[in-house]
Regions:
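A compositional/biophysical signature of low hydrophobicity enriched in polar/charged and small residues
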Residues: 1-78
Length: 78
């Protein structure tokens, strides 16, 4: 049985680029939800990955976007 790795990625984004970053992130297949937020983080992303290695690739792809300044990843405990 394949167990999906569920995680949340929270990110700070360059000022004024929150919605642009969210639109780019929404296009990623593994992303199930993206919220632009107020507070410490600008964007919250819900991800479902096939493995921890797959999650690592997804997070790396998000971090490489020019709008993204910093991320933190919260991996769900089953």
């Amino acid at each position: 049985m394949v167990e999906i790795v569920k995680a949340y990625v929270v990110a700070t984004v360059k000022r004024g680029k929150e919605h642009e970053a969210a639109q780019k992130i929404r296009k990623m297949e593994e992303v199930t939800e993206v919220l632009v937020t107020y507070g410490l983080y600008d964007v919250v992303v819900r991800v479902e990955a096939k493995s921890l290695g797959h999650l690592d690739k997804i997070v790396t792809d998000i971090r490489q976007m020019v709008e993204i300044q910093q991320t933190s990843t919260l991996v769900g405990a089953q």
